[in-house]
Structure formats: structure tokens, C-alpha cells
Amino acid sequence: MSFSIELELQKFPLTVKLRDGKRATLRPLKKNDEKDFHKLFLGIPERERMFIKHRVTDIKVIREWCKKIDVGRNLPIVGVIGTKIVGVATLHQQLGGWRRHIGRVSVLVHPDYRGRGLATLLVETIADIARRAGLEKVEAEFIGEQDAAMKMFALLGFRKLVHLEEYVKDMQAISHDYVLMGLNLKVDEEYAGVGG
């Protein structure tokens, strides 16, 4: 099956209903989202920002991301309520090499909008795109303290693959446990079509 991410993106924007009854729009990040996207990161508590691999408080970093969107490598889907970007999930892909069949998922939701199911909807959307793109697996990386996020991913079928104690350092050089979770996207051919 031939798959084009650009073709898949034509189904956006999507309107979704959150647990609290409010509606959110899911859509790809756009070049002109720079200021609103930066505001999302500024709204994340400093303690949590230490776990983000990039200096997201620097507008230049966000500007570069928005300017150079390459959906084949990094596909960010944002969650918007009203006109405010309140969450993002990204599918990170390697286009060659021995991990080309594995995508990586990252997700972030503004604290004021957590607990409404937005992160779940964003990750499900990204996993669906990954599956349709022919990826066989997706992974998600965590710092050991991110219990709520790991629980949400587990409810979506991700399982713990690796847990390394005191393995990574945050932006303040403090060591933390590293956890890698994964989801198998490949349908077992033996069971394909069963029950239908």
C-alpha cells in the first residue's frame, strides 16, 4: 500500500470532543503558528520544561521548527481550543537506517487543559498516521517521574521496553531514570480479519 503523509493530512482539521464536553481542533502545525506555539511552551512549568530536550523558551528554537516543518521527518499535530494552541503530539521518523520502521511519539499538553483527554486523542491520531505510513512500531521516551504520562501511554497499549536508573540528565544536570515504552503497530497476519 502506497502512503502519502501529505494525502493523510488532507483530512485535517479534525474537530474532537473532549471529556469535559468542549471541542478542540486537531491540525498540523503551520509556519505562522510560531507565537502561539511558543506560548504553549512558556505555559509549561519550569520543572517540566527541564525534561524537554530543546530550549523551548527560546523563540528562535520555535521559529526554526515552524520555518522548517518537514512532515516526513517530524510531523507535529497541535490541539487548538478557540484560537489557543493547548497541546502538541509529534511523530518523529528516521527515513533510513536500521530504525526506519520505528517512529517516536512525543506529546505535551498545557497544564490548564490536562485531564480532558486531549493527550490521548493526540497520541491516537499520531499512532494512526504512523500505522498508515507503514511504520511497524512507535516508541515514547520518559523520565522516571512522568508517571501520569506513562500510565496514559500504557492505557493506549504501549508497554515498557527499557527502564534504566539514573541514566539521563535534565537541563540542570540532575540525573533521572530513563523509560522507553513501545507500541507494536503491525497487525499479526494470523489474526487479521478475525471477527469481521
What residues fall within each predicted segment?
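Short acidic N-proximal helix/loop "leader" segments that mark the beginning
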Residues: 1-20
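Glycine-rich phosphate/pyrophosphate-binding loop shared by adenosine-nucleotide-utilizing enzymes
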Residues: 22-24, 82-88, 176
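A short beta-loop-alpha structural element at the N-terminal edge
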Residues: 24-36, 158
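A short gly/proline-enriched turn/hairpin at secondary-structure junctions
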Residues: 47-54
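Acetyl-CoA-dependent GNAT
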Residues: 54-101, 106, 110, 184-186
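Conserved acetyl-CoA-binding loop-helix of GNAT-fold acetyltransferases
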Residues: 107-109, 115-132, 151-155
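Conserved catalytic-core motifs of GNAT/GCN5-like acyltransferases
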Residues: 139-142, 154-176
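C-terminal "cap" of GNAT-fold acetyltransferases
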Residues: 166-196
